[in-house]
Amino acid sequence: MIDWTSWMDYGFMKMALAAILIITPLFGLMGTMIVNKKMAYFSDALGHSALTGIAVGVVCGIPDTNISMVIFAVVFALLLNKIGSRSTVSTDTIISVFSSCSVAIGLAILSKGGNFSKYSSLLVGDVLSITKKEIGYLVIIFIVTILFWITCFNWLNAICIHRALAKSKRIPVQLMDYVFAILVALIVMLSIKWVGILIINALLILPAASSRNLSVNMREYHVFSIIFSVFSGVMGLILSYYTNVATGPMIVIIASVIYFVTYFFGRKWKE
């Protein structure tokens, strides 16, 4: 018989659980606005830019790659927003160009001399290797994000509903775009090592998309998204322990199952 509590005997599992309980609510919360603002490509591009952030850290001799990833991601996010707001080319095209270029540069630098193998774990992530220092980073970004959400949510929501009307109400639309992009960049970069570059975007999008299938108002939209995100994270961690598979992909599998269930039964729920 399977002992469903044996995983709690290990310190690294407790550390992983702490990280998941801190960051998954942010995935659920920020994901709602990412879906509303149709920024799925943007968050995906940020995830892929992590390789370049690490490469910059290697070239500059920065010992903590988290710092180089965060700095590069913030610059990358601001640059995308700036060019996207001024260019006549579609936003998706601009993001694709920047993302492809960023990944290529990162791969070129990291693969020089055949050393890329030691960075391959970033593709699928490894939450079990998270450190107390990295959890500290997550706690800081959690507090900052919650404070931002409490103070600026109404502005963000107004911008999503009608951008021109928000400007007429003297809401700092451009500033909100920049701050939101920076927060997404920080959350993505500080989570990338344990979630994985290939699937980080799924954890931002799937809980919010699932919630949208069920919710009938904004409160439900946020609550369901956070619940789905936390549930996927915790169950993914536990099941990955017993099935001996990577935690990141398992979390995404569970989140995907939730999405399909809510997609097919969401209409009945709303009725």
Region locations from a protein language model:
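Short loop segments and helix-boundary regions at transmembrane helix junctions
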Residues: 32-115, 211-223, 240-242, 266-268
